[in-house]
Each structure stands twice: as C-alpha cells, then as structure tokens.
A protein has these predicted regions:
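N-terminal capping segments
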Residues: 18-144, 299-311
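Positively charged n-region of N-terminal signal peptides that target proteins for export
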Residues: 1-5
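...with weaker cross-activation on analogous glycine-rich loops/strands in unrelated enzymes
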Residues: 110-244
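Bacterial N-terminal signal peptides
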Residues: 7-14
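Low-complexity, Gly/Ser/Thr/Pro-rich intrinsically disordered linker/tail segments
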Residues: 233-311
C-alpha cells in the first residue's frame, strides 16, 4: 500500500535511526501504514467461520512473533488478516515502534506485555487498553507518559444525552472550524465517534457501552490520521468495515466529512521511548475506567478528559 511518494525515504529515516523529533515518529507511523497489505478482510467475530479461517486476534498473534531468546518481536503485517479498526491501529503502532526502536530503548519485558492476548478483555493489559471502547489508545498513551491527547465534542443532539443545560449542538460550520482539526498531524492516531443523528441515533455523544436496552451506545472508529482532502474531509487509514462483503474490506484509506463526526480524540505520541513503561503493564493489570466502558456504564466528557490527560 503506497500512501506517499516519499514512503521509501520515510522508512529509511526510521530504520536508520536518524530520529530527531516527534515528527520523525509520525513519519515512522506513516511508513508502518505503508507496509500493510490492502484489505485482507474485516472481521470482529470470536470464532472462525466460512469466510475467515481465523479470527482477528488469532491473526494478530501469528503476526506478532517473539521467542524466549528474542529481545524484541517481529511483526509481519501480511499475517495480520483479517482485521478490525482497533486491531489495525494496534498493529500499526507495534510496527512503527519496531521501526523506530533501533537503539533497543524498549525492553524485552515491555515487548512481551505488548503481545496481543485473547484473554485480555477491554481495559486489561496493553492490548486490552488499545482495543477498548472510548478513548482506549489515548488512555494507554497517557498512562505510559508517551504523548498527549486533545479532544473536541460537537455536543449532544438529544436532550437525553446532554451533560448540562447549556450544552449546545454545534452547526456544521462551527464544528468544521473547531481548532482541534488544525492540531492534528498526519501520523497521529484518532478516535472518531460517529454522528448518526440523521438516523435518529445520538450515539456520537456517548462514550462506552452500558448494555441498557433503549440507550444510545458508542459507535466509533479507531484510525491513523493522514490529513485532509481538498474539500476539508478527514482522510484516514484503518481497517474499514463492515459492509456487504467483509471479505473484500479491511485495510484501506477512507475519508469522511467532519460533520459525520460528533466527538474526536487526537493522540499525538511524542515519547515513543516511554513505551518501555509497558513492562509495568502485565496482562492482568486493569484500567477500571476502560473496563467499565465494556458493558457496565457510559463515561462523561469530563471523566474522559481526565483519563486522557486533556483537562
């Protein structure tokens, strides 16, 4: 998958270790994106089926290989198929860290804790944080001290989801002009909370899932930000789906108008060396905020901002 004409030069910067700034990290992310195949299938199921001989988590484990004698893993993007959105951003993060870490700043213990495990539910361990509802990757980066997050919210459309009496749903023009869009850099990670108000749902105002019948539940997308189209639409890479034929979906570039997003979290990694702190994040370590978003409750905007360090 070729995204930029400078992809080979970007990869050379990462692999050579000629890194001087956070911008170079973002270039490693873009080079990592470029190493992934196109499509490969979109699948969120927990068991193989007639369309997919393995699940996404099984595919991730095949792609992430580290034996007992290895100080760091290898990650083979071609094996990480099928996929879904948060598996794609997790996989790109791992690949980018491997491209960036030419000086072995990240310990074997940290790498081992980054291994994706099917036993890690949302909010548990490294993978369980990256895969969680809400701002999972943003919380993970904040916990590790590896970067910063910014967030913006258009407001709830319905009274039932408003957090205060003075909360207002911004017009398309106001939302498109929000300063958050100017602060995102290609190679940043984004969590997009979809605006589904035209269909009668206010799910874009909701953070997490509470499994209460009749309540709106979060509908979001974990992506790598690539920039903007000439008309201002958001351009991103992820595993995009579902659709009519999930076998022909998966890794791809997508775009959407800003009006299709109701809430956004932008995660900007500035200290990739701090991913070594994952050595203190074993598979059974729990982030209760994230684990609660997996069927127990919704979060408020204020709670989310605290958890991602963006108060």
């Amino acid at each position: 998958m070729r995204i930029f004409a400078t992809a080979i030069a970007i990869a050379a910067i990462c692999i050579s270790g000629l890194r001087t700034s956070a911008t170079d990290w973002n270039e490693c992310v873009l080079a990592a994106v470029d190493s992934f195949p196109e499509r490969g299938g979109y699948y969120t199921g927990g068991r193989p089926n007639a369309d997919f001989s393995k699940t996404t988590i099984q595919a991730l484990n095949e792609a992430f290989q580290m034996d007992s004698a290895d100080n760091r893993p290898s990650f083979t993007p071609a094996l990480a198929q099928p996929s879904f959105c948060s598996s794609a951003t997790y996989a790109v993060l791992i690949k980018a860290l491997l491209m960036w870490d030419t000086d072995n700043a990240i310990s074997r213990e940290a790498w081992e804790n980054m291994r994706p495990l099917a036993t890690e539910d949302d909010g548990f361990g490294f993978w369980g944080r990256a895969n969680a509802n809400g701002p999972g990757l943003g919380v993970l980066v904040h916990e590790l001290g590896a970067g910063n997050n910014i967030a913006a919210f258009r407001g709830a459309y319905s009274e039932r989801n408003r957090e205060s009496d003075n909360e207002r749903y911004l017009s398309d023009e106001e939302w498109a002009a929000d300063s958050v869009w100017d602060k995102a850099t290609p190679g940043d990670f984004m969590k997009l909370f979809w605006n589904r108000n035209p269909s009668g749902s206010d799910s874009g105002a909701v953070i997490g899932c509470n499994n209460v019948a009749g309540d709106d539940q979060e509908r979001g997308h974990s992506v790598v930000f690539l920039g903007y189209e000439p008309n201002g639409d958001i351009r991103y890479w992820s595993s995009n789906g579902p659709g009519k034929d999930n076998r022909n979906l998966g890794y791809s570039i997508g775009s959407c108008p800003r009006s299709h997003v109701q809430r956004v979290v932008v995660t900007h990694i500035t200290r990739p060396d701090r991913f070594d702190n994952a050595r203190q994040m074993p598979p059974d370590s729990e982030n209760r905020f994230l684990s609660d978003l997996n069927g127990r409750r919704h979060a408020t905007t204020a709670e989310m901002l605290r958890q991602i360090g963006a108060e």
